[in-house]
Structure formats: structure tokens, C-alpha cells
Amino acid sequence: MSAIVEDMYLLSSSMKMEKQFRKRHHSDSSDDDSSSPKSASPSMDDDRRAHHNELERRRRDHIKDHFTILKDAIPLLDGEKSSRALILKRAVEFIHVMQTKLSSQGKAIEDLTRKNELLEERLLERESSGSPSSSRLPALAVSSSQMQLTMPIIPQMQNIAQLSQYPQQANIIAQSTNPAQLDGLIALNNDAILALLGSFQSVSPSLLDSAPGTPPSGFYPCAFSPVDQQMAVKI
């Protein structure tokens, strides 16, 4: 655009100079004719005419060069023979196309900027709030492991609790049961007690002060203390 403006400025300036030159030439010729027609020197007219022709040639070359540059810059004129009027027409069309593209690209950039801002806000919200799922996973794992440990022990401990609540019935059962069955029942109860103590070892290790494989005396049920076991075996 600046080259076109410069060409228009040079064209207007050259036209002004040509008008001034014509006025001066006309005034000089009229003065020479009125005063003395023979006194005008032909060398001065030739110099002025040569100077004017040089200026006009420079102006035309300048305009021609810039039209060539404009033609090369417009992709719509590739391989097409064009006049100056066609070059200017294609240049105007190309300018309109580029303005449309620039406006659409500007809107796309604004949309992308808005989306990036929304994503940054969501990331900040997630970082500030934290992920609740990750904090719940260890608690769920611990509770499930505790349930797996305690579920096999619960039925056996219920049987022990029932025997401890009714010591007379426990003595009758011990007297009427065979020694082999009684030993198996005692071993089953001991295994249940050891499993229970193993589950509590991480909480209070002081419960397992006795020798390994032998449950402490305080955890025997009333019907199956060490004395009752010996009496039952003797019977």
C-alpha cells in the first residue's frame, strides 16, 4: 500500500511540474514573440525539453517497477498477462480476502484464549480441592483387610462366648465327650484365640508376651482353663 501511495504522489508531482513547465514555456514564448522573436535562443528550449523528458522517463520507470512488484506479490496473477488496471483490480480483491482471513483468525485466537483460561481455572480448582478418590483408597484397603481377618474368627469366638456364659453345661459336655473329640475342640478354640491375637498384634504387641504357639492364660474360657483340660483328659 505504501508503494502505491508513493507512486501516486510521484505521479501528481510530475504532473504539477509538467503544468508549471508548460506555463513557463508559454509565457517565455509569448514574451519573446512580443519583444523580439529573433532574440530567443534555441539551446534553452532544448535543455528544458530534455529535462522534462528525463523527469517523465524516471516517473514512468518508477511506476512500472512498482507495478511489477505488486504483480509478483499477488498470487491471483500467477502466469496471467495483465495490464495495470487488472493488477490494481486483483490487488483490491486480494486485500479484501486477506482482511477476511485476518478477522476470522482473530476470532479463533480469542476463542482459544478463552478456552485456555477456562482450563487453567479448572486445574487450579482441582489442585486446591484435591482428589478425594486417592485419599479414600487406603482407608478402604485397610477396612477390607480387617474384615477379612475378623470374619473367620467371629463364629469361633461366638462358640467360645456361649461356652463361657454357661459353665455348667460346658462341664457336662466335657464329661460326656470323648477325649479325642475334646482335644480337637480345645485345639480349635486355641487356634481361634491365636488368630484373634495375631489380628490384634499390630495394635497392642504386649498381648503376646507368652511363648509362641501357646495362648496366654487370661484368654481361656471359663470351661476350658488348663485345670479343666487336664480333668477332662483324665476322665
From Swiss-Prot:
UniProt induction comment: Down-regulated by fasting.
Q: Name one GO cellular component term.
A: nucleus
Q: Which coarse location class applies to the principal site listed for this UniProt protein?
A: nucleus
Q: Where is the bHLH domain?
A: 47-98
The family database entries (SUPFAM superfamilies) matched by this protein are listed as: HLH, helix-loop-helix DNA-binding domain
What is an example of a GO molecular function annotated in this UniProt entry? RNA polymerase II transcription regulatory region sequence-specific DNA binding
Q: Tell me the compartments it is located in.
A: Nucleus; Cytoplasm
Enumerate the InterPro entries for this protein: bHLH_dom, HLH_DNA-bd_sf
Q: In which tissues is it expressed?
A: Expressed in the intestine and in the AWC sensory neurons.
Q: Where is this region: Helix-loop-helix motif?
A: 61-98
Known function: Transcription factor which regulates the expression of genes involved in lipid metabolism in response to nutrient availability. Binds to the E-box motif 5'-CACGTG-3'. Under well-fed conditions, binds to the promoter and represses the expression of lipase genes lipl-1, lipl-2, lipl-3 and to a lesser extent lipl-5, thereby preventing lipolysis. In response to a high-glucose diet, promotes fatty acid synthesis, elongation and desaturation by up-regulating transcription factor sbp-1 expression.
Assembly and oligomerization = May form homodimer. Interacts (via N-terminus) with skn-1 isoforms a and c.
Family membership, please give it: Belongs to the MAX family.
The protein here is known as Protein mxl-3
Q: Which organism is it from?
A: Caenorhabditis elegans
Read off the lineage from the record: Eukaryota, Metazoa, Ecdysozoa, Nematoda, Chromadorea
- What gene is this protein a product of? mxl-3
